[in-house]
Amino acid sequence: SSPVPSTIQFVLEPDSLRERVRVFFLQYWDLIVLEDSVLVKLKTLFRTAYNFFNRIRLKNTDVTLIASNCNGCCILHDLGLKFNSPFVNLWVEPSDFIKLCKNLKDYLQYDLVFITPAEKEITYPVALLKDIKLYFQHYSSEEEASLAWNRRKGRINFDNLYFLFTDRDGCTKQNLLDFDQLNLKHKAVLCHKPYPDIESAVYIKGFESESCVGMCMRYRSRFSIRKYYDDFDYVAWFNQT
C-alpha cells in the first residue's frame, strides 16, 4: 500500500470504511491542530483584556511585594507593575520566609553569599542571606542573580510593603499560624483549603485533594482565561493602603 501523505488529499469514492476513515483524518487533522493554535491566541487576547481591567482597578501602583515564590512576580507582571522587590524568580522555604518577613530590614543589610547546594538535582544558583536560603530557580548564573537582586533591592518602598506566602514547599500548619501572627499590615497566604482560624489565609480552589496549592500562576483549564491565583482579589488587596 502507498504511504499516508502528510498533506490533505481528497480521494474520490473511497472503496472501504478504512479508506473513508483515512480520508477523514487527512482532511481534518490540520484543522484540529489549528484549533489549538487559535485557542492559544484567543486565551492570550482575553487574558490581556482581563489584565487590562485589573490595571484600571488598581490605584496603588508603587507596590513592593515580598513573595515566597514566583506567584508574586507573575501577579506583578499581569498588572504591568515594576519589580520593586528583589524577591523575583526565586523561592524561599516556609520557615526562612517567616524569619525574613519578621526582620526584613535587618536581613536586607547583608550581602548574598552563594553556596553549593547539597541537593544534586538543584542546578540553579542558591545563596545565603545571613542564615536563610534563597533559591534563584529562574536564573542561569550567580552573576545574573546577584545583579538582579541588588538592582531590585534598591527599589524597595518600605512604606508600601505587601507579603505573599503559600502553603507549598513543606509548609506546616504551624508555619501558617506563625505567619498569621506576624505584625505586618498587608499579608496573605494562598492555601489549598479553608483555614477559618487563620485571618490571612486565602482559599484557592482546585487543590483540595492535595497537601498544598499547586502552581497558582497556571490557567485553571485548557479553555479558561483565569489563573488559580485569580481566586485571590490581589487588586483589592493592593488597594488597601
Question: What do these predicted regions represent?
Answer:
Residues 48-167, 171-172, 197-208:
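Positively charged, amphipathic N-terminal segments that serve as targeting/anchoring signals
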Residues 6-60:
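Membrane-proximal basic amphipathic "stem/tether" segments
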Residues 164, 185-192:
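Short, hydrophobic beta-strand segments that form beta-sheet elements in well-ordered domains
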Residues 178-184:
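Short, conserved loop/helix-junction motifs that constitute active-site signature segments
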Residues 192-240:
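Polybasic, proline/glycine-rich intrinsically disordered low-complexity segments
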Residues 172-178:
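A short secondary-structure junction signal
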